[in-house]
Amino acid sequence: MNMDWKNLIINIPDYPKAGINFKDITPLLANGAGFKAAIEEMAMICERQNAIPDVLACPEARGFIFAAALAHRLGIGFIPLRKPHKLPREVAHINYGLEYGEDCLEVHKQDIKKGMRIMMVDDVLATGGTMHACMNLLQSLGAEIIGAMFLLELTALKGREKLGTAAVYSLIQD
């Protein structure tokens, strides 16, 4: 597809704090043709790579938008990884370090089956810390991670390196 993705993402300097160059994806979401094209391109990547998973999984929050739409397009399920105390059934969790602290994600244990083929999805790949933690959590429950897909990859932060041997796909590299 010949979509000029970068024109649909706005750089916001010094947000949410000084020194951070925030990538605002909401203009892409607000553009019907752009959003549809992004989902179609993600689906085509899965189809071309023969990488149709059993389900998609995604950490909250903005990635949910892409993962849910892509799961619908592919006709498969979507498993959310949530912040603590958001899921009502028995959960497995993982604590992981961030640049300035620690965070935790949870998933319903019974939703993950041994050998389940999962494609991870998120809006942005930055340092890779959150996605690495998600992948470790799901693998600890017996899932097979077949890859990770992102709308935007911030290549200078080298997040791809943190994801090990997983196939990494991104529509935009910046």
From Swiss-Prot:
Cystine connections: none
This protein's pathway: Purine metabolism; AMP biosynthesis via salvage pathway; AMP from adenine: step 1/1
Keywords: Cytoplasm, Glycosyltransferase, Purine salvage, Transferase
GO BP term (any one): adenine salvage
EC number annotated for this UniProt entry: 2.4.2.7
Major localisation: cytoplasm
Gene Ontology cellular-component terms listed: cytoplasm
Coiled coil: none
GO molecular function: adenine binding; adenine phosphoribosyltransferase activity; AMP binding
InterPro entries membership: Ade_phspho_trans, PRibTrfase_dom, PRTase-like, UPRTase/APRTase
Gene3D superfamilies linked: 3.40.50.2020
Pfam family membership, one: Pribosyltran
Cell location: Cytoplasm
Chemical reaction(s) catalysed: AMP + diphosphate = 5-phospho-alpha-D-ribose 1-diphosphate + adenine
Top-rank taxon, per record: Bacteria
Enzyme category, top tier: transferase
Subunit structure: Homodimer.
Known function: Catalyzes a salvage reaction resulting in the formation of AMP, that is energically less costly than de novo synthesis.
Similarity comment: Belongs to the purine/pyrimidine phosphoribosyltransferase family.
Name of the protein: Adenine phosphoribosyltransferase
Species, as recorded: Dichelobacter nodosus (strain VCS1703A)
Name of the gene encoding the protein in the UniProt record: apt
